[in-house]
Amino acid sequence: MPKSVKPISESDKLSDHLRDSSLTSEINKPDFRELDLGSPVSPLRSQPRGLTTTTTTTTTSSSSSSSSGSVTGRIKHAPVIGRSNSVRSQSNSSSGNNNLRPRSDSATTSSSSHSQPLLSSSSSSATSPAPTSPANVLPTGNICPSGKIQITGMTQSRSRSDVLGSGTGTYGHGSIMRGGGISPAKPTNTGGGSNSPVNVGSSSRSSSTVATGETPIWKKAILGSDSEEVKRVGNEMYRKGLFNEALKLYDRAIALSPTNAAYRSNRAAALIGLSRIGEAVKECEDAVRSDPNYGRAHHRLALLLIRLGQVNSARKHLCFLGRPSDPMELQKLEAVEKHLIKCVDARRVTDWKTVLIEADAAIVSGADFSPQLFMCKVEAFLKLHRLDDAQSKLLEVPKVEPFPVSCSQTRFSGMACEAYIYFVKAQIEMALGRFENAVMAAEKASQIDPRCNEVAMLHNTVTLVARARARGNDLYKSERYTEASSAYAEGLRLDPCNAILYCNRAACWFKLGMWERSIEDCNQALRYQPSYTKPLLRRAASNSKMERWGAAVSDYEALIRELPHDKEVAESLFHAQVALKKSRGEEVLNMEFGGEVEEIYSLEQFKSAMNLPGVSVIHFSTASDHQCKQISPFVDSLCTRYPSIHFLKVDIDKCPSIGNAENVRVVPTVKIYKNGSRVKEIVCPSKEVLEYSVRHYSG
């Protein structure tokens, strides 16, 4: 039916003029934002004329008719008629030229910043543009003329989300569309005849479907026989961050077309999204073998190899055409290479502090998934006797499984990369006293790189040290302490920094009554492993045997901080404190090891407790007070850590006579008595102030 001709308004002319001068429909145009220049009054939007965009609906049959899906506009109170758009193609659809078809490309990694498509989205057949939807219609009024008017979102300040589209053109970082939360989808064309409806951005999907990504489209694609269609839906899943679903679809596409390099490259992209870097490398290598001239697979493989710290292999793939495919990535590669060289040089001269600096710099420069660089930091911490840092850094080492065959034989600091990982692991296992694990790790390193002298020497050392330690343990259990000490000494000759062997030999000296030598070995063990509690306990016991009560109390106090609930340590500390007081001539009559806070129920009981010799700490509280509830557990812990002090608790609600006698008006209040005299009163104490006061008066 012919449309009636309406006079063109001034806003229409301005809109057409700006649209014609600023908007184009170039296929390879970078990411863009549609510019609406209609009436600033209405929130409704109309279909811009002369533009082809990625469609949000699809044709349902091969006939000339098609239906447009409706979408929700950006203004919630005003419904909008959805736009039916045509799919981007490499040819000009108006001229009917279908000779040019886009080449199938694969996904880029998230870390790259180059103007290539995110995922391969080539179509297996040409598609027809959908009919243009009617323009929005406004009611007549004195502001806008009646009839059809170009409407804009010019007055809207609300931000719109960026949605990855599915066009076939080269858009830079994928096909980025501007929208209000609706995911666009291009028409499904299975190549035969009719197109299947696609409603990827439908707001009516259930939350469970959105969470899993297993939509009807996904289920249909996974059973499909058209590899291009399967790949297209896989790309949609990838763009939404549904990497598991995308991976399954790429697997299906590869099963249908095993020699297609783009499918394998896309599968690698999904694996990268799942942090399965080792598998992604293998997939890229398979893609390159399938199509040695496929630049996208070479580029993605180069980026992965940079992340793994494999700079030589990465350069080969980055410059496979004789020149770098991405100058920015080449700069990243060169930065990683520079710091790697400095790191290896510093390791060669055992400058472990520089090793830490350069390894960190290489990781920050781009080698953020390199196991050998992380293990190099572990080794540096170990050599600097910072075992706690080495252990925590060991947990951060990236797991590359399976380790790529092409990477395993490349060299790092003179040994195979994979062998170096086990080389360091053997050292840290031995330092922690897990000798059997150390032997297995050293054997693994030796199997991977049997010709490396450094690996062979470590394997021999670890094996001999483990044997010496096992022999020493057997002799110690048989109470042959002198022979056991000799066995441990043999292990220390091979590994002179092993805290476990020093501690074991100290135990032998203790049993033989050689307290001074026991203390010396404990000092050595603590030098190499400061947080190791066993040598601290043995040194405290040796100091007690030699009646060095001050040193013994100091060691036991350090132990009680590490082991606050250990009753044996608390009791040993109490006896050492009593002995120290006695050696100073202080009165120690009737001092008993308590270990628990004593609750007072009567004024007579309170007065009796005040007359006890030594230091008494009284905690005045009420059961209902929040601050009292917070401080009570801390008072209990102080009682365990300072066993020579009497800790008493008074609930002034239950015993108001005591509160009145002591003039307690605010809780919590702590009073400290020494030999029956009050020396300190603290109202609402903090934990720090309370502990400082207790420690001060316990000495």
Swiss-Prot record:
Residues 9-20 have a biased composition (Basic and acidic residues). Residues 166-182 have a biased composition (Gly residues). Expressed in the root elongation zone, stele, root cap, embryo vascular system, leaf axilar buds, silique abscission zone and guard cells. Induction: By salt and ABA treatments. The keyword Repeat applies. This is TPR repeat-containing thioredoxin TTL1. Involved in responses to osmotic stress and abscisic acid (ABA). May act as a positive regulator of ABA signaling during germination and seedling development under stress. The modification Phosphoserine is found at residues 39, 42. It holds the Pfam family TPR_11. Residues 52-70, 83-135, 195-210 have a biased composition (Low complexity). InterPro entries: Thioredoxin-like_sf, Thioredoxin_domain, TPR-like_helical_dom_sf, TPR_rpt, TTL1-4. It comes from the Eukaryota. Transmembrane segments: none annotated. TPR repeats lie at residues 227-260, 262-294, 296-328, 419-452, 465-498, 499-532, 534-566. Disruption phenotype: No visible phenotype under normal growth conditions, but mutant seedlings show reduced root elongation under salt stress and increased germination rates under osmotic stress and exogenous ABA treatments. Keywords: Abscisic acid signaling pathway, Phosphoprotein, Repeat, Stress response, TPR repeat. Residues 1-211 are annotated as: Disordered.
